[in-house]
Amino acid sequence: MTTASIKKRDPRRRLLPWLIVAFVALIGLAMIPALFRHDSTLQIRASRQGVSLPDGFYVYQTLSAQGIHIQSITPEQDSLVIRFDSPEQSYAAERVLRKLFAQSFDIAHQPGPGAASWINRISLLPQFVG
């Protein structure tokens, strides 16, 4: 009787490691798009005190009129962050915005998601370099 019960449990025990491997593989496949994301961001800040940020809708209209596709525009810590689908669109937008806002605003590229952003997401304390 014990051999019969052991034979019934063997297929389950053999199946469990394969289910775990399949689960880990599915999680890995779900994470691939986040690892190979190529979006690019620009940050607009006021270059001196007393200058207010430009309206996000105005920036959107201006860049759209130039044929530049924008993923999103969000205000973040006294700045305006604009996300684009590709670095080419980001550089084209930078040229347009530098002409438009001349000396009033600082326009800079933000670094893409790297190790520091992953560490900050899982850490209790933010990590800073420099």
Swiss-Prot record:
Periplasmic side: 37-130
InterPro entries found in the cross-reference section: Modulator_MzrA (IPR026574), SecD-TM (IPR027398)
Pfam families in UniProt: SecD-TM1 (PF13721)
Broad class of the protein's primary localization: membrane
GO CC terms, sorted: plasma membrane
Location within or outside the cell: Cell inner membrane
Topological relation to the membrane, as annotated: Single-pass membrane protein
Alphabetical UniProt keywords: Cell inner membrane, Cell membrane, Membrane, Transmembrane, Transmembrane helix
Disulphide bridges, residue numbers: none
Protein's UniProt name: Modulator protein MzrA
Origin species: Erwinia amylovora (strain CFBP1430)
Lineage, uppermost ranks: Bacteria, Pseudomonadati, Pseudomonadota, Gammaproteobacteria, Enterobacterales
